Structure formats: structure tokens, C-alpha cells
Amino acid sequence: MEDGVLKEGFLVKRGHIVHNWKARWFILRQNTLLYYKLEGGRRVTPPKGRIVLDGCTITCPCLEYENRPLLIKLKTRTSTEYFLEACSREERDSWAFEITGAIHAGQPGKIQQLHILKNSFKLPPHISLHRIVDKMHDTSTGIRPSPNMEQGSTYKKTFLGSSLVDWLISSNFAASRLEAVTLASMLMEENFLRPVGVRSMGAIRSGDLAEQFLDDSTALYTFAESYKKKVSSKEEISLSTMELSGTVVKQGYLSKQGHKRKNWKVRRFVLRKDPAFLHYYDPSKEENRPVGGFSLRGSLVSALEDNGVPTGVKGNVQGNLFKVITKDDTHYYIQASSKAERAEWIEAIKKLT
């Protein structure tokens, strides 16, 4: 990393004039967040734009877009709003932590609060949020939504915040009420649950990360619409139930060479095991469905040389490249943002081939 750079990597940014979403390379410095356009796997200089952090406010998690639950919102001193999407909850929280640190540099009390926050949201490795939600939907042992009343209004198919905390503990997903609240907050952040009614919506607006979910018998929640599987064909049924049923092992933004036009585009890659698949998503699209993917059974993965443009790579793209050859001899050319990131992906994929 260059001198003075606090963090760098891909984020998906909402456009100012046309509200489309595009992947940009972001570089965080002490008081500035720069973002660059990419062409041929390389960032184009000068930067496409810069966000001055002095006087900025940050909202994380930002729930303004239902289909984009991993957002950070920055509001500058001049009230310009930036919406930035990360590839995972961990990466979003890492960016939010570093950006908040850059905003509050020179205020030790704020930095100490940040360190407490950073260490408070850890999901145990043996627990999958998808598994928790599946169990919640179980007709015999799950949590049963029912009509609930709040301030004179009746909300159908809801459950109480305190009831969910009770259920998480009784189902052995959490050992204490504090742990259960943390888990419930994660489920809400990842768009599996949503708040309903005045009490729970008010907690979201308070902006306090530690108090997003309320262990309260007056706070109402429901399953988010995004959890309901929209199935329109036999092909989609087989894709969602088999390929996408595995446990997520790793995810992140990588550049990929297209098969037909050979152009390079940033995609969000998700590596799953049991069954072993590597899928990739178009981060500019709203729907959370892969645009491609392949089974890793019988695949080969290897790093490509860093000196010059390797064989099979189109354009002047070089550095941090690796290749996956599938069982049916399809070649995928992928570029990481650093040697370390490339090594991590290769190691993770090799374990599943």
C-alpha cells in the first residue's frame, strides 16, 4: 500500500445525476476518499472524484435501498450524499471503521469508541445466517409470525423483538441476550429481517449501531421480502436449491475477463462449499442473482506470471492475475487487487477442487 493510504479497494458507488451503480476503486487517505474509474484492469488517473471527509457524517448500516443491504452513506458538509456498497458485511464494517477514524482523526475518545464497536460484531464461524433464517421458517420449531398491535395499528405476520431473542437462545444460536441481540442485528443488516412500526423503526433512525435491534416486547419485526424466493422456471429452481445452497467461504470484488468480447469487468465473486461452486454477480444490477458460475469439482487454479501480459489475456492487463480451468476446459481469467489477495483466493479455491 502507498504511503498515507489507510485503505483501498473496490466499492460500488451510486451515480449523482443518473442513479446507476458502478464499481470504482477507492483510496482512503487521512482527510480524503478518492475514487477511480478502471479500464483494462487498471485505475485511470487522475481520480474520477474525491470526497472531502472533514465535516462528513457516516451512516452504517444504511437501509435506504432494500436490495442493497451492505451500504455506507456519506453526507458531506455541503450536504452531498454518497452511497457506497461493499461486497460483504465484514468489508462494509471495515470501510466504515476506517472512514470514521479518518473523519474523527485527532479525537482520541471517538477512536476508542470505534475500537469497541469494531470488536463487538463478530459472527461465530460455525453459525450461518442463512441456516438461522431457515430454522426461523421451520413450521414446527421456528418463530411464528402473527398479528400484533402497536399504537392502535395492527401489523400482520410480525413477531416481537424479545420473542426473537428468546427463540435464538432456546435454539442454541446464542448463549446470552446480548449475543442474541447481536445476531438479530446482523440478520437485519443482511436484509433477512426488517423493522415494522414506530418503535423498531425509531431504533434504526437513532443510528446507534449497538441498539439497532430492540430486545423489547413492544418492538415489532417481520421477514424481509427479499428472503422469499422468486422462482420462475425449472432452471432457476435447480440453480437456487443446489448451486447456491452451499456455505459461503469467501467473497469479494475481482476483475474478470469476458468470454466473448474479452473485456474486463468488476464482479462480486462468491465462493461456496458443499457443493463447491464459484459464482459471480454484476454489482451494478439490483437483483441478487449470479450472472455466471461454475462447479469447482475437477477444476485447476493457478497464478499467472506478473511480467508482461500472459497468454490468453486480452489487452494490456497484467499483475495479480490467476486462471481457473473447469472440468469441461473453460478458462476463466481473473485479476485480484494485490498479490496477497490473489494468494488468498487461490488457496481458498484449491481446497475445494
Curated annotation (Swiss-Prot):
Residues 4-104, 247-353 form the PH domain. It holds the Pfam family DEP. The modification Phosphoserine is found at residue 120. Keywords: Acetylation, Cell membrane, Cell projection, Cytoplasm, Cytoskeleton, Membrane, Phosphoprotein, Repeat. The modification N-acetylmethionine is found at residue 1. GO terms for molecular function: phosphatidylinositol-3,4-bisphosphate binding; phosphatidylinositol-3,5-bisphosphate binding; phosphatidylinositol-3-phosphate binding. May help orchestrate cytoskeletal arrangement. Contribute to lamellipodia formation. Overexpression of pleckstrin 2 causes large lamellipodia and peripheral ruffle formation. Residues 139-225 form the DEP domain. This is Pleckstrin-2. It is a peripheral membrane protein. GO terms for cellular component: cytoplasm; cytoskeleton; lamellipodium membrane; membrane; plasma membrane. The keyword Cytoplasm applies. One of its GO terms (biological process) is actin cytoskeleton organization. The keyword Kinase does not apply. Its main location: membrane. It is found in: Cell projection, Lamellipodium membrane; Cytoplasm, Cytoskeleton. Ubiquitous. Most abundant in the thymus, large bowel, small bowel, stomach, and prostate.
